[in-house]
């Protein structure tokens, strides 16, 4: 059989068949290494490039173990973003559809009551973001979250970002209700080894448990990005970035390709979306100041190619697996070189070809140098779109469109809600401190 | 009060529904003022007049003798003065609540009992509210939340407010709206223009700002184009220089200007120290880590 590989790693027959039906035949390096060890019952820390199949590396052994002894609330997967949670849940459902699997998504921005009802039904797997799960742990009754005390698996996907200050409080709440650490299996997966993850892998062995299994593909070859990814840069002044972007998106080479544009701020994302929309580019956006319904819709629209350009903040930089993406544009250069790796990792997935383009302004030289050092590769200059073309075709048009969208945003009060929320939180904290 | 009508769209959105009503009101007024438009253009009403209306009286004027023209002028002047007066005399009432699903036409009919109603505006309920109502099995009809009505005579407006406020609509006993209690308030010293003034002003400011910004952006663009051309020129000069000198000596690239660079902040364990973000670990995070492995 062609897929004896997965079987030899110890996966159940039904799972191998399900994977086979999805044309997943050959296990990747991280899957080969991690699946047998996890099946043995060891804790695991896995580090591998973007798009190297980390999801299956923890899904396959969990599903195998679960099918041996099906029970409600078998495993919890924590992810940093809502969209990633939905994607993982989709994959779990797809793999386990033959076994009547029940997967619950517990993420922010959706009905709390609905989620509580779903938790009461004892789903087999819970895919959650820490904030909302913590809310349930704190506020729901015993019948809703009692099952969490018997969880067998805890997975932290994108562990490097989960193990930061941002999530620490919620994470602590979530972990507090789970069984003690030697009664469950902990799996950490990440594309970046941070101090925290390193510290965990060096942590002393807990009693009654085999030692932690640490696996890092990255250390084999020191290139952090996929080999099929082309990296280019374009030197451009700050205030004409939009014009260049528009020209590139409408240039012959890219007029039909799907692409993701990464920005650093939600405001920039909104400006760009409006500008490009008024210039008749099929565009959608994803950032934290959109209602959850719209966020989900826009990811689906992009997946279904109803929109060909997705403008996103770093909320989309991790984990999202959309195979059709051909070009990733770093409209703003991220401060953290590893963020670049994650962003660029949205394309060139699973051996496909992909391109990543950086817009470099006069202030970003240092950042780009840090990125080049990190990925161990020099970027080439982007030459497909020249200055003359931009000046002649898009400059005036785009600037007018940008100003108009700025005005419209001003009128509609973009960002007001967030400011209000911030003020509310601050005043709440103040009263909290006083009491 | 500005909050209630701060959104221009609200005004626009009602147009399909009560346009006829508004137009009938306008037409009535147009007839009154039709004659006094051609010469006193500065006195023109804010309402947009159609071209047709202007042409008709012109033809008439040609046929008249001079004396008659003089008379006509006098008459028009008089009319204009009286018209100004009527503008002064208008009164606006505010309705804090509109009976459920009542349409502007019906409301106009009710208010006309007290005197001639000129303009009427009802604010439609918000879209998501409507959707929610329909979703939970409610009526699909449009509901209006509040409204304003302009009476040609103040007297009528006051009468309307004092009579209708807090009372049922009445009429025939079987009427659908017979028992609905109205809430009408006369707004003293308030004109219809006050309602739209703020929105119009805001729009004007926005438009002016937009023009200003676009012109500024164009200046920046011109500068950019200039710079691109300059760089091309400089590059060519450098090339030709190189060719002439046959690389006899290294051309010194002097640094003309430096820019303040944005910060690099890495959290990776193996990153060089210059890029590392100093991150004091909090107790909470430590606890989590301990409870994990």
From Swiss-Prot, chain A:
Domain notes: The Q motif is unique to and characteristic of the DEAD box family of RNA helicases and controls ATP binding and hydrolysis.
The keyword rRNA processing belongs to this UniProt entry's keyword annotation: yes
Main subcellular localisation: nucleus
Keyword Transmembrane helix among record annotations: no
Source organism of this protein record: Kluyveromyces lactis (strain ATCC 8585 / CBS 2359 / DSM 70799 / NBRC 1267 / NRRL Y-1140 / WM37)
Protein name: ATP-dependent RNA helicase DBP8
Family: Belongs to the DEAD box helicase family. DDX49/DBP8 subfamily.
Chain ranges for the short sequence motif Q motif as given in the UniProt record: 4-32
Domain of life (superkingdom): Eukaryota
Assigned keywords, A-Z: ATP-binding, Helicase, Hydrolase, Nucleotide-binding, Nucleus, Ribosome biogenesis, RNA-binding, rRNA processing
Its biological purpose: ATP-binding RNA helicase involved in 40S ribosomal subunit biogenesis and is required for the normal formation of 18S rRNAs through pre-rRNA processing at A0, A1 and A2 sites. Required for vegetative growth.
From Swiss-Prot, chain B:
Assigned keywords, A-Z: Nucleus, Ribosome biogenesis, RNA-binding, rRNA processing
Biased composition (Polar residues): 267-284
Residue stretches of biased makeup (Acidic residues): 7-19, 36-58
Annotated RRM domain residues: 91-181
GO biological process, any: small-subunit processome assembly
Molecular function via GO: RNA binding
Cellular component terms (Gene Ontology): nucleolus
CDD domains: RRM_ABT1_like
SUPFAM superfamilies documented for this protein: RNA-binding domain, RBD
InterPro entries associated with the record: ABT1/Esf2 (IPR039119), ABT1/ESF2_RRM (IPR034353), Nucleotide-bd_a/b_plait_sf (IPR012677), RBD_domain_sf (IPR035979)
Residue ranges, compositional bias (Basic residues): 234-243
Highest rank taxon of the organism: Eukaryota
Job of this protein: Involved in the small subunit (SSU) processome assembly and function, and in the 18S rRNA synthesis. Required for the early cleavages at sites A0, A1 and A2.
Protein name as annotated: Pre-rRNA-processing protein ESF2
């Amino acid at each position: 059989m062609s897929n004896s590989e997965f079987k030899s790693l110890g996966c159940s027959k039904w799972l191998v068949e399900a994977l086979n039906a999805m044309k997943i035949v050959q296990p990747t390096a991280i899957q080969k290494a991690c699946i047998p060890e996890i099946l043995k019952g060891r804790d695991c820390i896995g580090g591998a490039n973007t798009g190297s199949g980390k999801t299956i590396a923890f899904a396959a052994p969990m599903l195998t173990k679960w099918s041996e002894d099906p029970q409600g609330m078998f495993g919890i997967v924590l992810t940093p973003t809502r969209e990633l949670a939905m994607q993982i849940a989709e994959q779990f459902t797809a793999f386990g559809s033959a076994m009547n699997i029940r997967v619950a998504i517990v993420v922010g921005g959706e009905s709390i009551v609905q989620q509580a009802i779903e938790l009461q039904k004892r789903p087999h797997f819970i895919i959650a973001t820490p904030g909302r799960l913590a809310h349930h742990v704190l506020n729901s009754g015993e019948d809703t979250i009692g099952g969490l005390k018997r969880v067998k698996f805890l997975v932290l996907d994108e562990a490097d970002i989960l193990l930061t200050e941002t999530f620490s409080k919620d994470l602590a709440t979530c972990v507090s209700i789970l069984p003690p650490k030697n009664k469950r299996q902990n799996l950490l997966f990440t594309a970046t080894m941070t101090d925290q993850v390193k510290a965990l892998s060096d942590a002393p062995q807990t009693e009654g448990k085999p030692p932690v299994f640490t696996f890092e593909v990255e250390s084999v070859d020191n290139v952090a990005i996929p080999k099929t990814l082309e990296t280019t840069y374009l030197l451009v002044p700050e205030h004409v970035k939009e014009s260049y972007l528009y020209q590139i998106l409408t240039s012959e080479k890219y007029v039909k390709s799907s692409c993701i544009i990464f920005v650093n701020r939600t405001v920039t994302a909104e400006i760009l979306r409006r500008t490009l929309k008024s210039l008749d580019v099929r565009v959608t956006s994803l950032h934290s100041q959109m209602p959850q319904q719209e966020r989900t819709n826009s990811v689906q629209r992009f997946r279904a190619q109803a929109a060909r350009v997705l403008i996103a903040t770093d909320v989309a930089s991790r984990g999202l697996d959309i195979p059709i993406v051909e070009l990733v544009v770093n409209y703003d250069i991220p401060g953290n070189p590893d963020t670049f790796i994650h962003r660029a990792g949205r394309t060139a997935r699973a051996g496909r070809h992909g391109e990543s383009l950086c817009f470099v302004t006069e202030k970003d030289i240092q950042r780009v140098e840090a990125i080049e050092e990190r990925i161990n590769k020099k970027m080439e200059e982007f030459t497909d779109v020249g200055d003359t073309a931009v000046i002649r075709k898009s400059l005036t048009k785009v600037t007018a469109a940008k100003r108009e969208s700025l005005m419209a945003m001003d009128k509609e009060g973009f960002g007001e809600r967030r400011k209000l929320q911030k003020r509310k939180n601050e005043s709440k904290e103040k009263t909290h401190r006083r009491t | 009060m500005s909050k209630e009508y701060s959104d221009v769209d609200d005004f626009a959105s009602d147009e399909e529904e009560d346009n006829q009503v508004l137009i009938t009101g306008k037409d009535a007024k147009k007839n009154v003022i039709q004659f006094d438009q051609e010469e006193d253009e500065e006195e023109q009403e804010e309402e947009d007049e159609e071209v047709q209306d202007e042409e008709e009286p012109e033809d008439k004027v040609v046929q008249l003798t001079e004396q008659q023209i003089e008379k006509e002028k006098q008459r028009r002047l008089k009319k204009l003065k009286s018209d100004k007066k009527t503008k002064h005399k208008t009164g606006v009432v505010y309705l804090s609540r509109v009976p459920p699903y009542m349409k502007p036409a019906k409301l106009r009919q009710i208010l006309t009992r007290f005197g001639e109603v000129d303009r009427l505006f009802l604010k439609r309920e918000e879209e998501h509210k409507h959707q929610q109502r329909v979703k939970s099995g409610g009526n699909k009809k449009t509901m209006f939340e509040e409204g304003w009505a302009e009476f040609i005579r103040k007297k009528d407006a006051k009468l309307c407010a004092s009579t209708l406020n807090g009372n049922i609509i009445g009429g025939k006993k079987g009427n659908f709206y017979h028992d609905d209690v109205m809430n009408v308030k006369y707004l003293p010293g308030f004109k219809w223009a006050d309602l739209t003034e703020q929105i119009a002003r805001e729009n004007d400011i926005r438009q002016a700002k937009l023009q200003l910004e676009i012109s500024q952006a164009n200046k920046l663009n011109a500068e950019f184009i200039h710079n691109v051309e300059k760089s091309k020129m400089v590059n060519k000069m450098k090339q030709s220089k190189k060719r002439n000198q046959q690389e006899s000596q290294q051309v010194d690239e002097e640094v003309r200007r430096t820019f303040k660079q944005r910060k690099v902040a890495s959290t990776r364990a193996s990153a060089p120290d210059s890029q590392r973000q100093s991150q004091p670990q909090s107790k909470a995070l430590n606890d989590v880590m301990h409870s994990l492995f």
